[in-house]
Swiss-Prot record:
Its EC number is 6.1.1.15. Consists of three domains: the N-terminal catalytic domain, the editing domain and the C-terminal anticodon-binding domain. It is found in: Cytoplasm. GO terms for cellular component: cytosol. It comes from Haemophilus influenzae (strain PittGG). The gene is proS. This is Proline--tRNA ligase. GO terms for molecular function: aminoacyl-tRNA deacylase activity; ATP binding; proline-tRNA ligase activity. Its main location: cytoplasm. It catalyses: tRNA(Pro) + L-proline + ATP = L-prolyl-tRNA(Pro) + AMP + diphosphate.
Length: 572
């Protein structure tokens, strides 16, 4: 491709509204342009990367036995009503009517459509297992689109759905897809972790997220220093270590009129925060016990996903308001504690090991100091309620936990029969009776993959594609002052034609630009291999080579250039 025949839309300055690196560089590199909030045009450089990512995904999905289909973006409301999600899905679901006043949605996901398709096309257990996938546009009406294509309203996704007669069959395909996803992200050159995850609004049982580690990520990824354990922070088990120490002082009631938060209590009374607890009041699952107290250490954070799994706690978790708390307990939120508490309490594992701690007295403006379990207050039920922190023991007993930010680029679920039962998707079983199919679901955010690769691989000059396979071009030919040197132009043209004939994805910068501008543009868009042709070097029989990823520069004899290039491109 010649730049003179290409839409080469690089920018020198970073747009003010671009907050994260990937958004900034995708705009500067001329990969995308905004059209409306959360909607983007993909320009030639961007679409080249996107298509290469899709190619890798297709190849690995096909190797894993999945079969490609294509389903409509526009979906009839009846399918969503049948699954029950018409009423469950929030405002992210864009609903509209056609000219016949029939309700439709722009698909944020395709569980309903694929279930309807398979129940029409598959009638016997002999046709299963079956794994179908598509690469298709999705739309979610995000309340606050941000970070460019990282969280946009319209995006491209690879979604696959598998159908089975047994849980064992689903598990086998799930394991295959886990490996397929690992292969995809390894080929993309991404530093990622496959983590245990919550199933969220899609539902189901087992679930793994594939998280690309990056400081701009929205998720906390927890992993062990000495094993392959990894989990989303929502699911990472918090292990309490040590033993409860014997009391060393008598419990006493202290006036604390100006200490309504843990921070104020610690500062005003010079207490170690590890010797304080905080009491959070949430709605109960049972109308006979409308309020429940959750007690965690003062420096820990409540894990709402874990807490709402306790049978006494309402799911989804909902905090009680000040009026409800005051009416039931007689004190405000800054003075709550375990002593003389008149509602059920659940304490975190770490709290169960505490002694001589401080907590609210359930009297406004007062706290108890030197509280001890059993001696001063009966030990409540113990449950894992908190988020893990860095340095906690790994739940598998190997090493300690590290926490890094992650960008979710893939998610696999064992859906079970959530959709097939609701939509009566059955096949004839071996015994001749109707059998409800068991389902799996496997998604990759294709556009998000592009952004996450940039988040993880860039420098002050621009993008560094982690794999030659996804760079917009593999080789850049940069002839300096070509329009003033017949020798440079002739050699550049010959090299361009030769590389093209060898199937190399090459961009030939034939613009009438200063060399500095040409170098800057090629580095900005991240071309892995740059061949610089200058008149003086050419007279000496040499060509300059630059490697974007390693920063390597070397002079190569022009007679050996092709063989050296072929060697450097051998990973393709």
């Amino acid at each position: 491709m010649r730049t003179s025949q290409y839409l080469f839309s690089t920018l020198k300055e970073t747009p003010n509204d671009a907050q994260v690196v990937s958004h900034q560089l995708m705009l500067r590199a001329g990969m995308i342009r905004p059209m409306a909030s959360g909607l983007y045009n993909w320009l030639p450089t961007g679409i080249r990367v996107l298509k290469k990512v899709e190619k890798i995904i297709r190849e690995e999905m096909n190797k894993g036995g999945a079969i490609e289909v294509l389903m409509p973006v526009v979906q009839p409301a009846e399918l969503w009503e049948e699954s029950g999600r018409w009423d469950q899905y929030g405002p992210e679901l864009l609903r509209f009517e056609d000219r016949g006043n029939r309700n439709f949605v722009l698909g944020p996901t395709h569980e309903e459509v694929i279930t309807d398709l398979v129940r029409r096309e598959v009638s016997s257990y002999k046709q299963l297992p079956l794994n179908l996938y598509q690469i298709q546009t999705k739309f979610r009406d995000e309340v606050r689109p941000r970070f460019g294509v990282m969280r946009s309203r319209e995006f491209i996704m690879k979604d696959a759905y598998s159908f089975h007669t047994t849980q064992e069959s689903l598990q086998a395909t799930y394991d295959v897809m886990y490996q397929v996803y690992s292969n995809i992200f390894n080929r993309l050159g991404l530093d990622f972790r496959a983590v245990q995850a919550d199933t969220g609004s899609i539902g189901g049982s087992a679930s793994h997220e594939f998280q690309v580690l990056a400081s701009s990520g929205e998720d906390d990824v927890v992993f062990s220093t000495e094993s392959d354990f990894a989990a989303n922070i929502e699911l990472a088990e918090a292990i309490a270590i040590g033993e409860r120490q014997a009391p060393t002082a008598e419990m006493c009631l202290v006036d604390t009129p100006n200490a309504k938060t843990i921070a104020e209590l610690v500062e005003q009374f010079n207490l170690p925060i590890e010797k304080t607890v905080k009491t959070l009041i949430v709605k109960g699952a049972d109308e006979n016990q409308p309020l429940v107290a959750l007690i965690i250490r003062g420096d820990h954070e409540l894990n709402e996903i874990k807490a709402q799994k306790h049978p006494l706690v309402a799911d989804p978790l909902e905090f009680a308001d000040e009026t409800e708390i005051k009416a039931k307990i007689g004190a405000g939120v800054g003075s709550l504690g375990a002593v003389n508490l008149n509602i059920p309490a659940i304490i975190d594992r770490t709290v169960a090991l505490m002694s001589d701690f401080s907590c609210g007295a359930n009297i406004d403006g007062k706290h108890y100091f030197n509280v001890n379990w059993v001696r001063d207050v009966a030990m409540p039920e113990v449950f894992d309620l908190r988020n893990v922190v860095e340095g906690d023991p790994s739940p598998d007993g190997k090493g300690t936990l590290q926490i890094k930010r992650g960008i979710e680029v893939g998610h696999i679920f064992q859906l079970g029969k959530k959709y097939s039962e609701a939509m009566k998707a059955t096949v004839q079983g071996e015994d001749g009776k109707p059998l409800v199919m068991t389902m799996g679901c496997y998604g990759i955010g294709v556009t998000r993959v592009v952004a996450s690769a940039i988040e993880q691989h860039h420098d002050e000059r621009g993008i560094i594609w982690p794999s030659d396979e996804i760079a917009p071009f593999t080789v850049a030919i940069v002839p300096m002052n070509m329009h003033k040197s017949e020798a440079v132009q002739k050699y550049a043209e010959e090299l361009y034609r030769t590389l093209q004939s060898q199937g190399v994805d090459v961009i030939f910068d034939d613009r009438k630009e200063r060399p500095g501008v040409m170098f800057a543009d090629m580095e900005l868009i991240g071309i892995p291999h740059m061949v610089v042709i200058g008149e003086k070097n050419l007279d000496n029989g040499e060509i300059e080579y630059k490697n974007r990823r390693t920063g390597e520069k070397e002079m190569i004899s022009k007679d050996k250039l092709l063989s050296v290039l072929n060697e450097k491109l051998g990973n393709l």
